[in-house]
Amino acid sequence: MNTQILVFALVAVIHTNADKICLGHHVSSNGTKVNTLTERGVEVVNATETVERTNIPKICSKGKRTVDLAKCGLLGTITGPPQCDQFLEFSADLIIERRDGNDVCYPGKFVNGEALRQILRKSGGINKETMGFTYSGIRTNGTTSACRRSGSSFYAEMKWLLSDTDNAAFPQMTKSYKNTRREPALIVWGIHHSGSTTEQTKLYGSGNKLVTVGSSKYHQSFVPSPGTRPQVNGQSGRIDFHWLILDSNDTVTFSFNGAFIAPDRASFLKGKSMGIQSDVQVDANCEGECYHSGGTITSSLPFQNINSRAVGKCPRYVKQESLLLATGMKNVPELPKKRRKRGLFGAIAGFIENGWEGLVDGWYCFRHQNAQGEGTAADYKSTQSAIDQITGKLNRLIEKTNQQFELIDNEFTEVEKQIGNVINWTRDSITEVWSYNAELLVAMENQHTIDLADSEMNKLYERVRKQLRENAEEDGTGCFEIFHKCDDDCMASIRNNTYDHSKYREEAIQNRIQIDPVKLSGGYKDVILWFSFGASCFLLLAIAMGLVFICVKYGNMRCTICI
């Protein structure tokens, strides 16, 4: 007997096309990437540059009292060489030193000149008053061909004191000046180092020369050093200029017996200004608050990569050429329509990391499908909430950096006056520290922005979930399948947070009962397939055994057991 058994399997697929509402955000692939505390190169929807790299190649002086010193060096405004005659007294908001400006005419130098230069740069100008010194028995009109006006002359604010006649003895003298003003006085004097001992004797008589200067806070003695030196401006002698700040009601006393360049007037600094060294053109038609040797930086950004020596109200210098500040959420392209496998938190992680192309009205938005079709709309409330928190982020960053950098600048100002060129190393160290700090601050703000965007999306998602309750089911992709008919007005009520779940509750329950028994989530499909396969095998085995049993019973089959 030949028996053939045919087994057919019937698979029924029940498809539901439920109304659905989804949550997402606007994306626009633009390649804008920022760094956060935990990740580098995170693509975001929007970002703002925080490092300025361009400037105006002019000194913008509109609205400022500008003093362009031209051939005059800034220190020369105190002593008065011929090239500085028009700048002996002035008022300024902006002082411009040129590279070919000169502080002296008779060769020499200012001791601690850079510290004095810093003081003058920050002053708003200079006025002067006579010190009232009178002399007898000596000449006070020493001149030199190195300081020429109509002929040989000397520093306008100094007196070159000489013996009454050549080679005559120079008498011992003492002169004092008391500062009777409320503000400190700047006092400058000089020590003349002759080109030879013979020249010194001719000018001041024979014997050793000594100059002593003292006040309540200052005391110093100076011995001139005659000797042969290379000629500068036709002179082999040198004048060293020294200075001190004389407090109000304090007195300075000079004691000398030759080789002394005496001050004629005391200088008083007034107000505040900015001083820069630059050779670029001055433009009175543009405005600026930040200057450097190459021009004017006009920027509202917190950092700049143009010049570390910029002065004024400036962005702080950093080494980085770019530090992007995120002003929008993380930019993740729209996921394919084919659903991806997700973990336990897929419903949350899914929509946060999924953006929709093409929406320009807002960041956070809804998509829906129903019998009337599909639609997309922005959620302005969530969008505005995020914008309100992100707006002003750049200004807050400026406040943070300005406050910190200003403290550092103030801390090192006094050091600069005391140790001069060591400040160059200090500034380099400050740049290193604050370049790192700037990168860290921007990364922290970027992390906060991205976390904020996720937080606002979570709030929006929870708002929708609490409205729908049992009338809908999350599908793990940031969408809700709604168990009742939801027209455009219904969808609008969900978006506007005016949805009444009780109105649709009965319909939703009925539809849920019909859908749930046949709705298989992806996690159970494999289990049911294996169960079906096992049951089919068992059924085939049972049928085969039944046929064998019937055949044996009716004699159609004999079973012989051999031992």
UniProtKB/Swiss-Prot annotation:
Glycosylation sites: N30, N46, N141, N249, N424, N496
Protein origin, superkingdom: Viruses
InterPro entries: Capsid_hemagglutn (IPR008980), Hemagglutn_HA1_a/b_dom_sf (IPR013828), Hemagglutn_influenz_A (IPR000149), Hemagglutn_influenz_A/B (IPR001364)
The protein's name: Hemagglutinin
Quaternary organization: Homotrimer of disulfide-linked HA1-HA2.
Any one cellular-component term (Gene Ontology): viral envelope
Gene behind the chain: HA
Disulfide-bonded cysteines: C22-C479, C60-C286, C72-C84, C105-C147, C290-C314, C486-C490
Record field: transmembrane: 530-550
Ranges in the topological domain labelled Extracellular: 19-529
Lipidation (S-palmitoyl cysteine): C559, C562
Compartment(s): Virion membrane; Host apical cell membrane
